[in-house]
Amino acid sequence: MGRFVNSIHCTDDIAVVSPVLVSDKQEVQSLRNTSFPVYKHTFDIAQSGMMQRISSIHACGGYDRNLFIDSVDWEFVVRCMQHGYQTIRLNHCFLYHQIEDSNNHEINVNGHIYHTNRYEPLRYYYQYRNALYCRAKYQGSAYEFIWDEVLNGLDHAAEYETQSEEI
């Protein structure tokens, strides 16, 4: 990342530079054997390993203090894009990152028990809460679809984990 940040390609309109998050060495090998451009313009950037231009943080109003844990990064990236900044992921820079929790948890949603081994129940609460907040905040904008996708993904994950427990 340092090489890119110090290169002529890292112009003042780039607010965020991020690595690809990977979970193991096999994933790195697989990605290295695939032909990708050096970087990709994307909103799909996780805060883990993210390098941010301080001037862009100030120009975009900083982080939304209404958010906690999830969607903090994507919401900030969307605001950067709305302010005309680029947000990029370096396709040949990797960060080992484990986002899951290894314990089993029960979540009670409107009387329906979901079993999960990914996160603590409170984490799911913040994922849903923040996605709903961001969907309302960006309603009618070109970015509204992001949080619809997040909510769909959460619904499918909960459905999959429930089915896994039943098998």
PLM features: residue spans?
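Active-site donor/metal-binding and catalytic loop motifs
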Residues: 90-115
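A recurrent flexible, glycine/aromatic-enriched loop bordering the glycosyltransferase active site
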Residues: 35-52, 119
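A conserved mid-domain beta-alpha-beta active-site/ligand-binding segment of alpha/beta enzyme cores
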Residues: 121-137
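A short acidic, glycine-rich active-site loop
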Residues: 42, 110-125
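Conserved donor NDP-sugar-binding/catalytic core segment of glycosyltransferases
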Residues: 1-31
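Conserved nucleotide-sugar donor-binding catalytic segment
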Residues: 45-67
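A short, conserved alpha-helix in the catalytic core of glycosyltransferases
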Residues: 56, 66-99
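Non-catalytic, C-terminal membrane-associated alpha-helical segments of glycosyltransferases
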Residues: 14, 136-167
